[in-house]
């Protein structure tokens, strides 16, 4: 293919990493949750846009993968929380194959976190509590959008939103849709990546063993 113009070949793009502080076994926290909390706090303080954006990877029963960017809505020692329409592409894949991965691409700080694990639905009380905290426009949007369904045009979505706005007019409380809710990814592996010079990056992974303990492993970059 003859490509002309100002296109820059991806192979010519270079970025040298030179972290002031490497990631070592001595400065790593004692557990994945504390380490993630430390880095997440630093990302927020640094003012990165959408610091809670993460790439969610799923696969169907046949092993065909898909990925998309979603927003982290909570984390604790039990795992990472997100919300979606259960009938969406990711929702149906998680129902069929309840294992997933998360990637937090914090490249402005020369960092990345990769998480793998099993995914469970949140109980209804947790979903409803979070839904009640959402802006009203987002609540209406959850009712209006049959996520991942093919639409004939943009007007169909706008019309559905207006219909929901009329249905719940005058400040009527908006309940969580029955097909909308949360998932918690319970990690069995959490890798922390810190960029370093000469592509000799630091990769330290917390991995859950069959016995339920956690071990720390250094991975080759």
UniProtKB/Swiss-Prot annotation:
Cofactor: FMN
One Pfam match: PNP_phzG_C
Gene3D superfamilies linked to this entry: Electron Transport, Fmn-binding Protein, Chain A
Binding sites annotated in the UniProt record for substrate: 14-17, 73, 130, 134, 138, 199-201
GO terms of biological process kind: pyridoxine biosynthetic process
Domain of life: Bacteria
Reaction(s) catalysed by this chain's protein: pyridoxamine 5'-phosphate + O2 + H2O = pyridoxal 5'-phosphate + H2O2 + NH4(+); pyridoxine 5'-phosphate + O2 = pyridoxal 5'-phosphate + H2O2
Binding site for FMN: 68-73, 83-84, 90, 112, 147-148, 193, 203
Annotated pathway: Cofactor metabolism; pyridoxal 5'-phosphate salvage; pyridoxal 5'-phosphate from pyridoxamine 5'-phosphate: step 1/1; Cofactor metabolism; pyridoxal 5'-phosphate salvage; pyridoxal 5'-phosphate from pyridoxine 5'-phosphate: step 1/1
SUPFAM superfamilies: FMN-binding split barrel
Keyword Flavoprotein set for record: yes
Annotated cofactor note: Binds 1 FMN per subunit.
Keywords: Flavoprotein, FMN, Oxidoreductase, Pyridoxine biosynthesis
InterPro entries per UniProt: Pyridox_Oxase (IPR000659), Pyridox_Oxase_CS (IPR019740), Pyridox_Oxase_N (IPR011576), Pyridoxamine_oxidase_dimer_C (IPR019576), Split_barrel_FMN-bd (IPR012349)
Record-level Gene Ontology MF annotations: FMN binding; pyridoxamine phosphate oxidase activity
Protein EC: 1.4.3.5
Quaternary assembly: Homodimer.
Function per UniProt: Catalyzes the oxidation of either pyridoxine 5'-phosphate (PNP) or pyridoxamine 5'-phosphate (PMP) into pyridoxal 5'-phosphate (PLP).
Family to which the UniProt record says this protein belongs: Belongs to the pyridoxamine 5'-phosphate oxidase family.
This protein's name: Pyridoxine/pyridoxamine 5'-phosphate oxidase
Species of origin: Salinispora arenicola (strain CNS-205)
Lineage: Bacteria, Bacillati, Actinomycetota, Actinomycetes, Micromonosporales
Gene: pdxH
């Amino acid at each position: 293919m003859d490509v002309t113009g100002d296109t820059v070949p991806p192979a010519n793009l270079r970025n040298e990493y030179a972290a002031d502080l490497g990631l070592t076994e001595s400065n790593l926290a004692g557990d994945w949750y504390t380490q993630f909390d430390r880095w997440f706090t630093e990302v927020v303080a640094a003012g990165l846009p959408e610091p809670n954006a993460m790439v969610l990877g799923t696969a169907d029963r046949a092993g065909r993968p898909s990925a998309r960017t979603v927003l982290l809505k909570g984390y604790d020692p039990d795992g990472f929380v997100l919300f979606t329409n259960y009938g969406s592409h990711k929702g149906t894949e998680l129902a069929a194959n309840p294992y997933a991965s998360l990637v937090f691409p914090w490249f402005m700080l020369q960092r990345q976190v990769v998480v793998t694990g099993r995914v469970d639905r949140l109980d209804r009380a947790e979903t409803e509590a979070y839904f009640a905290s959402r802006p009203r426009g987002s609540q209406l949007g959850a009712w209006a959008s049959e996520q991942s369904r093919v639409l004939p045009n943009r007007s169909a979505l706008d019309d559905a939103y207006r219909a929901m706005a009329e249905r719940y007019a005058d400040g009527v409380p908006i309940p969580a849709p029955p097909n909308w809710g949360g998932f918690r990814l319970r990690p069995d592996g959490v890798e922390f990546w810190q960029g370093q010079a000469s592509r000799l990056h630091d990769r330290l992974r917390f991995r859950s063993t069959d016995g339920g303990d956690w071990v720390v492993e250094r991975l080759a970059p």
